[in-house]
Structures are given as structure tokens and as C-alpha cells.
Amino acid sequence: MWICANDERIRYTGRIDCRVEAEPVWVFPGSSAEFWFSGEVLRIHVENFNEYWQNYLGCILDQVQSAFYLKKSGETVIEVRVPENESGVHHVLFFKRQDGCHELKILGFEIGDGERLIELPPVSERRIEVYGDSVSAGESVEAIDFIGKTDMEHEGGFSNCWFSFPWMTAR
């Protein structure tokens, strides 16, 4: 079942370009989309606008984090493996892992035919905004083998804003 990117049951957070309502564009790290759904099928359709490095989409499904490689241009369809559970209900958070090395347009989502999106609980009134540099965006935060060493050469795979201090503070 196709779900439009602007479905009201999807909660977006972050600084997002919404000039085209049905195709939000994530520019800043930590921009995200979250929803609850039933079933065992989950796909996200995105269009990547690569500036440099390799680009990845972050996903947390039922509290398990993964990353998915994005093509440098054009549409990428990512199928997320959904494990079975007793309730058949799942929580997913897709997020922009990296900084300005790319922008990402959300084209829509898919779940299984006959399945449904489930209303999210109300959003908190609390807000946090952080101004900073690449460290604030989670740059190279997963490069744990290089702690205390000279910066390594990489293609962006060590960047993950989920582990940045602003997102950790917000949680």
C-alpha cells in the first residue's frame, strides 16, 4: 500500500524544505520521519542529491538501528526487513545520518496491502536547537578505531547524527 510522504500520520522533525508539500526535502542532519505501522513490509522511496562522499539513510525499526546506502542520484527504493513480533505493530524512524554532503527528497513509503498506519502519540512541547560544526552533526562519530589518532580518510560512512551530542541530549 502506497503512503504519500505528506500523510498526516507521519511525524517529521528537523529543518525540512516543504515547498513541495508532497515531497519534503531533508537538508540538515537529524531530519526525520517517524510512524507506527502494522505488517511485515516496509519500503521508503527517496531521491538523493549527492554533493560528496557516499550517502546513507538511517533507520531505527523497533529500536534496532541500520543504515542503507543511497545511490548518488535518481530514485532509490529501500526495502527494510521487518521482523515478526507478537503484536504485528512496528515503530520506524528514518533519519538523515549525514551533514551537508547530500540532500534527500522523500517520495513516499510502502507497507503491505491491507496493513495500516497507526496514530502516533502526541508530540512533546519541548524543543532544542543546537548551533555547531561537524561534530554537532555527528561527523565521524562511528570512527571508534581512530580515537586519539589523526583524522582518517573516509567516504562518510562513519558519520551518524543519531550518536551526536544534540540528538543524545534531546532523547
Q: Where are these predicted regions, by residue range?
A:
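Extended, H/D-rich, highly charged conserved domains that either
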Residues: 157-171
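N-terminal secretory targeting modules
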Residues: 1-132, 136-156
